[in-house]
Amino acid sequence: MAKKNGLTELEQLKKENEELRKKLEELEALINNDSDDDEELQEIENPYTVTNRAIDELVSPKDTMFYLSGNQISLILSAFEFARLPTYFGEEPVTELAEYAHKLKHYLVSKGGRGRRDILRVLRVSSGQTRENVNKSILKQLFDHGKEHEDEEE
């Protein structure tokens, strides 16, 4: 009888040990945000949510960006055109210039960091009329700010 009690106690301790291991794994998964049971809620894509997300990213930058003046912005944008210029004459495009402009476009911001950054990324996001109007407004503000900065330099 003592052996049976010992075996049942041993089995009970093994079960408790296994339950504690499972709880520990669940807690570690929660700490690491690796919970397989919970699926992330998908945000419904409509013009307002995409626009708001793009504006939020412009207003509160998540990473450090370089700040450029209006002249530098136009230089980057024209670099893409100059890279494509040889294609109009049947030649190969200048890939080095295009790659350089592609790297620089990630740092496209206005002087002073007023939140209008990475306009090209926002333009890539936009596809609807509402978002397009917001982006046109942002671009207009960006270029107006660039003109103000040029006047200050003169």
UniProtKB/Swiss-Prot annotation:
This protein may be involved in virus assembly. Essential for virus function. It comes from Sulfolobus spindle-shape virus 1. This is Uncharacterized protein A-154. It comes from the Viruses.
